[in-house]
Structure formats: C-alpha cells, structure tokens
C-alpha cells in the first residue's frame, strides 16, 4: 500500500464500501452467469438503468463514457445473442483468446487450477472465506472474483487490499486487454470496460500496488 492511513480510512467508509460492493456484485453476476438466467438479466437491467457516464461510482470519466456508449448500443442485442457470446467467452471448449481464469495467466503451463489458484484457496481457508460453487469452475474465474470483492466489502473490508493486490490485479489487466480485443457484442465489451475501470479506480483510491507476477499469456 502506498498510503496505509488513507487506505484504512476508505476501508471504513460505509459509502465507499457500499458503492464498491454494489458495482462488483452487478459486474460479477454479468461475468459469471449465463445472460438467460434471471439474476444475470436483472443485473444487466440494473446497469442499463444507470447513467453510467455520470452516476457509476468508480472509474475515470473517459472509461465510463466509453462503457456507457457501448452498453447503450448493446441494448439492441437479444438474450440469445448474448448467451451465445457468453458461452464462447466463458464456457467454450478449446483455446480462448481471453481465458477468464487467473492461473491460466500466472501458471507456466497456462492451466486452470494452477499455483495461484491454490494460493487463493489457501488464503480463503485461512480467513474463513467460503465461495459458493459455480458449475465446477475455479474460484479465480473473473466474475467470481468480482463477487468475492463484493463479499469482502460487506464482511471483511480489511482484506480487500491484499485480495486485489495479490490475487486479482496481478493478472486482471491482461485478461481485460485480451477480453476487450475479442468482443463481438457491445454489451460484453461495455461490461468489460466498466469492470476494468471499477477495479483500476478502486486500486488507485486505496493506494494498492499489485504484486508483479510473470504472465504467460
């Protein structure tokens, strides 16, 4: 942390924690559940109901303006189109341009359930954190990691800097770079821009300097 006192103050600020938690909940649902599922549909509708450029709680103005434009353009995309895109991005077999699992980036063999996943699991056990199973996917799936951010914001905010700095942000920027370059729908591109902007701003506000890992993708 660059400024521990400032970080501690923000982590005890109820307004910040509620804003960060709500943002991560909506984004995490959209990036972990099929668009045809009711909860994902509600989360998508909630984001579309917000003036993202003006009222989204975290993110730089340029990124939020871009996200708002993309999400607005994506309003014409139907659930079937979005579901096919979700399956291609998150559930398809074979090599994906942007694998949504952290250890694919940090493990030399580019595999799921790699060493950083094991480290994350050990960290979660040490702090008594449970993560509900999600179709047999590892906990370091990007949407599940956002949902874990939300859980920490509501239950144990002091763990947020370590979680972001050690377990998510060492690889998330590379994921978003590849993810945004592989988009075929405006909706998911907008969600990706919004998620990246939210995490980047939270790290900046909290003074988090992510750990440096060698990335293999």
Predicted stretch roles:
Residues 1-217:
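Surface/interface-facing alpha-helical segments and adjacent flexible terminal/loop regions used
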